[in-house]
């Protein structure tokens, strides 16, 4: 029983983000389709070769995607929304990009598919759309072509396919409502056809991803698995693949399926290996997801060995990454600026492949010397002074309930704030950022590269802040912002100014399409060595008599958009960040800043996959926000900003944040989101976004007025604010000026009644 290793998928973008550059060049019309396809071929060949060189036995094929793998599956099944279809029904790479980016075959704008988070990761997928009576057929054969490609290169491959039940679960019904699960029998023949084609190519194992099996699924969905897999059995061996959580609660459903193996995430799940071994059919292969595919930390392989060794020789066993390595940067070896000690604690995708090879070899031979050697740095980290800051740990331990309570209730605070700011009815503001022009980006880049000294950099930033204030005063906004010219990214900026974080040069991870992010890494206890935003906020406030908002990114968002430590809980990290930012609130207040916004766009997306785990998360998430904000005096107004499409299931927690004002994204849902706030009888002030900043379209005064009147039917007008639905960083100045002028005019019209 020789143990093999495999990965569930590999990063697609390339070490130097070659895929991103090729996509954007093609979209801009600067390169041909052939040139784009050639970059894809080159990247796939390189990535298979790199995994093989690192000792991976079975290489994943089908993990590459031109936009995202769920969209690839939609095209495979011929599921193209009518507005994006070619007249002759054909499907090509442009069809795929149109669904992702929003264009009709004629070149006219046509709404892109909705995009949402892939389970609880920071990766996104395009949501499949289903209509009643829909037909499916094998249409886009990218998977089969890539299998041919890999086999021609002499590789031993394992195709990767998103499973039928999870695919339907991830989609949404459009138009007349019906149960999308009823489409299962219509898509199964396409899956049968794909598996038959793979069998023809001599494929032994297919990795069929059903991550929905880690969720608390409705019974009807659990019941759908057996007939689905009865229909798919027999052509090739199926490795039923789950990740991001454990499978024990759904194990009875799983063990009844006619598959030949099961992959489980032994990093994020709480499944017990001995229990799994006992309950799985004895002839099944177990793929043990022991190496974390979602983080950047070197594994303690001695621990991983101990976790699995008792079942070695008792059943067929593979060792694997917990999930696809898509969520990890590619290669640590190109990081030249990381301190040697810190660098020794990390492993990126290629290093994780090496870990899988070390683990496989040790399990096959019983010789663990190499594991001990590999694990030494991560074991030494436990005692590093870079990790532990006694002052932070002491302060965290001393938190009391009082630390998360404002001095008085909202009604008392609102009176103090009205007396201080004397704002008109329908007060106008923006969410924080203004257009990041080429000049601003060049200024920051020159400073970062050392081509510009600190004095000239500061003079340049001050000039852009001054311009933002002048623009806002000219437009007649009531509460101003400094525009965030000095910030590259709302999380990275704070991470760079807090102790306990490090940054990589090339640690890029795909978010969706061509968008990549470079998350900060939390390596130790978090603290604030010096004020972060105070100087620029104070400068902006000195330029105007109107209030200027201080702008902070909240603790839960900083946590969710970073690679967290693995040696303490997420709650601990969030509260450490909250304490650091609490001091920032106090300093902003002392500097005369009376309105402070703490953005928490990630509060909802941090929710655990299982609803039964939500309460615990929301409790500490809300507490972290309140620790951050509660130091503010009554007449300091705390704002928060959130952008999601779903509030009703967490309204209690939104209200529990106790922010004086919440601004939300509502324009795309035509104010329907406010229903949740109305039904809940939300007590504080609210700024429903009146226009969609993701679109270059300028909303008319009438359109904004109509939306605000609609909002006033749900929320008392005296508690409403007027604002766009998100920051304006990605927009140009001409449309920003035009849209804000119309927004201010609409508010003035409503004041006149």
UniProtKB/Swiss-Prot annotation:
Amino acids binding 5-methyltetrahydropteroyltri-L-glutamate: 17-20, 117, 515-516, 561, 605
Binding positions (L-homocysteine): 431-433, 484, 599
Annotated positions binding Zn(2+): 641, 643, 665, 726
GO MF term list: 5-methyltetrahydropteroyltriglutamate-homocysteine S-methyltransferase activity; zinc ion binding
EC class name: transferase
Disulfide partners: none
Record field: catalytic activity: 5-methyltetrahydropteroyltri-L-glutamate + L-homocysteine = tetrahydropteroyltri-L-glutamate + L-methionine
Binding positions (L-methionine): 431-433, 484, 599
Pathway membership, UniProt: Amino-acid biosynthesis; L-methionine biosynthesis via de novo pathway; L-methionine from L-homocysteine (MetE route): step 1/1
Pfam families: Meth_synt_1 (PF08267), Meth_synt_2 (PF01717)
CDD domains in the cross-refs: CIMS_C_terminal_like, CIMS_N_terminal_like
Swiss-Prot/TrEMBL cofactor(s): Zn(2+)
Gene3D superfamilies reported for this sequence: 3.20.20.210
A Gene Ontology biological process term: methionine biosynthetic process
Sequence similarity: Belongs to the vitamin-B12 independent methionine synthase family.
Identification of the protein by name: 5-methyltetrahydropteroyltriglutamate--homocysteine methyltransferase
Organism whose genome encodes this protein: Escherichia coli O17:K52:H18 (strain UMN026 / ExPEC)
